[in-house]
């Protein structure tokens, strides 16, 4: 059962990071900006009144400075339009043109297709609520990240340790790099940190000295398994009601 939870944790971690990169480089968006766009689209479709910044803050609990930065970014990339309220020039009103509505809808459809392709290893996902599932998953990872584990391990460190666990506690640096989400996670610094924390041993292969072998310290294996299982349980609790 622990092995299954570790594999699920790794699959969710990968899904989160590749989606962040997809939005960042494919659409110049963060996850928070995506969530804001979805909210603006749904509000525009379901309400006749103008959408002000104060209404967004009320409904979505944004910090005003953070919201202004996101609104400015979305406006500059033509995701949204903005204007001054006709009866109060101090108030900023957010609107969407028909083309912008279509653009956001297309983004959502493309993202759902991307998630469907990238989530084949996650059997728990109901594909009718795929985007909602992912957004809950992303939010829950941020909660876990901020709360810190009892062993003070980061999610990236747990990801690498989890890869070693499912590789029978020992593998080469070359094999690990295959799963390193190239360009997203720099494995070298993480390995050095885990060495200094006493979780793994780095050595040369006896069969071929060109290869670097990474081995988990035996006394740390149960601790690592418990940490990852605890993180997965927290993740599961946060997304189970989607």
Please annotate each region the language model reported:
Residues 1-27, 78-79, 93-98, 102-148, ...:
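N-terminal leader segment of winged-helix/HTH proteins
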């Amino acid at each position: 059962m622990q092995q299954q939870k570790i594999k699920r944790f790794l699959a969710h971690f990968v899904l989160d990071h590749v989606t962040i990169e997809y939005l960042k480089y494919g659409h110049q968006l963060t996850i928070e900006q995506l969530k804001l766009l979805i909210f603006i689209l749904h509000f525009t479709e379901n309400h006749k009144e103008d959408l002000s910044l104060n209404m967004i803050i009320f409904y979505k609990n944004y910090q005003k400075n953070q919201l202004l930065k996101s609104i400015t970014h979305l406006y500059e990339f033509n995701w949204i339009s903005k204007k001054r309220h006709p009866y109060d020039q101090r108030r900023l009103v957010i609107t969407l043109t028909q083309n912008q509505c279509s653009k956001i809808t297309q983004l959502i459809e493309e993202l759902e297709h991307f998630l469907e392709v990238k989530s084949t290893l996650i059997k728990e996902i109901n594909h009718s609520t795929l985007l909602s599932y992912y957004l809950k998953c992303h939010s829950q990872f941020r909660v876990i990240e901020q709360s810190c584990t009892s062993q003070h391990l980061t999610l990236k460190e747990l990801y690498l340790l989890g890869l070693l666990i499912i590789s029978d506690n020992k593998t080469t640096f070359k094999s690990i790099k295959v799963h390193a989400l190239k360009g997203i996670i720099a494995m070298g610094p993480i390995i050095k940190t885990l060495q200094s924390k006493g979780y793994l041993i780095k050595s040369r292969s006896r069969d071929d000295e060109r290869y670097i072998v990474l081995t988990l310290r035996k006394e740390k294996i149960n601790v690592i398994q418990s940490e990852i299982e605890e993180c997965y349980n927290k993740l599961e609790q946060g997304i189970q009601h989607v």
